[in-house]
Amino acid sequence: MKPLFLQALMYPKLMPCRNMSGVEQELMVLAKEQEKEIKGFENIKFQSSVFDSIPYEVQAKELLKGIDSLHEYTGEFNEMLDVYKTQRISEIEAMFNKSEFTMGASQEILLDNRNKNWVKQLKEIMPKNNVFVAVGAGHLPGKNGVLNLLREQGYTVRPLVNK
């Protein structure tokens, strides 16, 4: 099994809340209740190929680092949740930049290239339809983040009021 997949399986078990469905799941339920069309930017095959693009040694190193830091994850998760809920985007970027895994070529593979592809897809979709776009927190900030890339294309990007 690939280290990235093991890591993805490990993280939910470390979260402070055991019944946490995740933001993505909650949005899916709301969309279905309101009979909204749900589309994804990528299929599973593509996502798997993204992981294959990252050298096995890098994946293994990050997995071991994660295992060695298990006790820190609860605090980091709570901090990330607070930063996300209060829309402090620059702090999200700082948190992701702490990880060696999201730096350099891995950041380009995991975030930057995918963000550019998503914005390209959005440019095709948005003129024809009203859309609600949800992406993981790491995809939001930075020069190559979805927010900045949309602004560079001339879109006005505003946060939703979080109540």
Where are the language model's segments positioned?
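Structured, acidic catalytic/metal-binding patches in enzyme active sites
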Residues: 1-110
